[in-house]
Amino acid sequence: MRGMVSFAVWALFAALLSQQLFASVASVRFEDAKTYYLSPPSGSHGTPPSHTPPSSNCGSPPYDPSPSTPSHPSPPSHTPTPSTPSHTPTPHTPSHTPTPHTPPCNCGSPPSHPSTPSHPSTPSHPTPSHPPSGGYYSSPPPRTPVVVTPPSPIVDPGTPIIGGSPPTPIIDPGTPGTPFIPAPFPPITGTCDYWRNHPTLIWGLLGWWGTVGGAFGTVSIPSSIPGFDPHMNLLQALSNTRSDPIGALYREGTASWLNSMVNHKFPFTTPQVRDHFVAGLSSNKAATKQAHTFKLANEGRLKPRV
């Protein structure tokens, strides 16, 4: 019986001792939790330690050793309530910033996180405006295409050639025309009056007025025919006003000579007219007869030559 009492006392003592030890341990853990999880007092903003992501993460997100700060940590529900101390311990800020150690290369696996309280409330994480620039490689922005405008072609019109001799114009002589005749020739014959009134026909036929000596040859005895000069022109011979047989022979003989040149059907040829004219100068009787014959031919009353 005495042994039973002794065992109960020891058991009670052990229970009290273990409860005291557990309360001390819980108080220490609570102070530690307050040191790491309590929000900093208002007005004081400490600069968080800068963490340079190591190059050995192999593309994994950067490792942040500092735990997230919960908004209101609550003690575990299954932990017995410790005795409330008489005063609230003031958490002290560690004088030095813990240096995080570089975890080994995870090669794509997510980094390990420190243990958190068994049932903390989910802290709120603000969404960063800029993603971390650690091991992540964002896609580069699309490049703006460069449009190259092709150069405008330069057309050289060339230098005009100025100078030089102008080309020689080609003159087509064409078919030579008929000699100009101011008035129509008579159809068959023309009287002495007709030729006297159309002096341009004589000029168009001979190119000049002509002479009696050139038409009928040199007169053998010019002095025997008073008033007539062998150098007189044909228009003067047609216009003489003598009323004797020699004057009539000059008028009609000159008209016959012109008709024989323009009309191939005239009864006498040009040589025949010349011969008959010279023969008529032999005497007044011969001159009268030949002048009458030339007059009939000039008026078209003789048979035309075939």
UniProtKB/Swiss-Prot annotation:
UniProt keyword Signal present: yes
Name of the featured protein: Protodermal factor 1
Record gene name: PDF1
Lineage, uppermost ranks: Eukaryota, Viridiplantae, Streptophyta, Embryophyta, Tracheophyta
Residues that span the membrane, as ranges: none
Function: May be involved in the regulation of meristem growth.
UniProt biased composition (Pro residues): 62-83, 139-154
Tissue expression from the record: Confined to the shoot apical meristem (SAM) at the layer L1 in vegetative, infloresence and floral meristems, as well as in protoderm of organ primordia, including during embryogenesis. Also present in the tip of emerging lateral root primordia.
GO cellular component assignments: extracellular region
Ranges of biased composition (kind: Low complexity): 40-56, 84-99
Cystines in this chain: none
Sorted UniProt keywords: Signal
Signal peptide: 1-23
Keyword Signal listed: yes
Annotated stretches, region: Disordered: 40-156
InterPro entries to which the protein is assigned, alphabetical: Protodermal_1
